[in-house]
Structures are given as structure tokens and as C-alpha cells.
């Protein structure tokens, strides 16, 4: 990394309370996006700000809620937001209430340009490229 484009900053305080698995994404327009696991592990939230510090006070929007049963009905963990090929995606782990440790990676895609306001579509479980990936406990992945 070119040191003229890098500035180290220390954050010595709690960033956002009651949020596990935090993920911050800096978009090409300079805005920062935040998502994380919530204590109830039942939904996916987003925050947006023009600064990293601003994320702490930014409005939190629930963009998706767990299913009542079946896949994606329990242990909604470790979401990440990414912008790929001009589309917004959230990758996260989720379990099945009938087998709560059958945690697998899933994908949501925003159907518009505004992740805070536009609807999100469930794209399903990530598809493995081999015979062993995602066949067992799978979480905290990245793209």
C-alpha cells in the first residue's frame, strides 16, 4: 500500500455496543457501510455514514429477518456487505431450527441501488466448487 494513501487511526473505545462479528465496507463513493450480528441472531442490520466514526451514531436499518422455520431460521451470524458487478450483496451464516448446528453460508442481493431502502432478495445457499465445502458447520466466510 502506498503510504501517501494510508493513515493509521486508533479506535480505543467501544465502536458499536451489542454487535458481534462487525464488518465495515468502504464503498467507491467514500461512504462506509456497517453490518454485524445482533444479540438475538435473528436479523441483518445495516448502517451507513460518510465517516467510520459516524457509523456509531448512524441509523440502524433492519434489511432482513430470519425465517420462522427451516433454513435461515436460527443463528443468523457474521454478515458481510459487498458491492460486486454493480450490485449489493450480503453474505451471512444461518442455521435450521430443526438442526440448529447445520449452519451454512447464504446470500442476499439488493434489488435496487439503495441497500437501506430497496428490497433484498434471498439468493440461497452458496454453492460449493468441490465435494466437501459447506457440507458441515460453515460460518465466518468472506468473498
Q: Whereabouts are the PLM-identified features?
A:
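Carbohydrate-active catalytic/glycan-binding domains of CAZyme proteins
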Residues: 1-143
Amino acid at each position: 500500500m502506498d503510504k501517501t494513501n494510508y493513515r493509521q487511526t486508533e479506535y480505543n473505545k467501544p465502536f458499536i455496543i451489542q454487535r458481534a462479528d462487525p464488518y465495515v465496507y468502504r464503498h467507491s463513493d467514500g461512504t462506509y457501510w456497517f453490518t454485524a450480528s445482533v444479540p438475538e441472531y435473528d436479523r441483518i442490520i445495516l448502517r451507513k455514514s460518510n465517516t467510520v466514526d459516524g457509523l456509531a451514531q448512524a441509523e440502524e436499518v433492519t434489511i432482513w429477518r430470519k425465517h420462522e422455520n427451516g433454513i435461515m431460521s436460527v443463528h443468523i451470524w457474521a454478515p458481510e456487505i459487498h458491492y460486486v458487478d454493480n450490485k449489493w450483496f450480503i453474505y451471512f451464516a444461518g442455521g435450521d431450527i430443526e438442526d440448529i448446528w447445520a449452519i451454512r453460508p447464504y446470500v442476499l442481493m439488493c434489488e435496487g441501488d439503495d441497500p437501506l431502502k430497496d428490497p433484498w432478495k434471498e439468493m440461497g445457499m452458496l454453492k460449493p466448487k468441490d465435494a466437501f465445502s459447506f457440507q458441515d458447520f460453515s460460518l465466518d466466510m468472506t468473498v
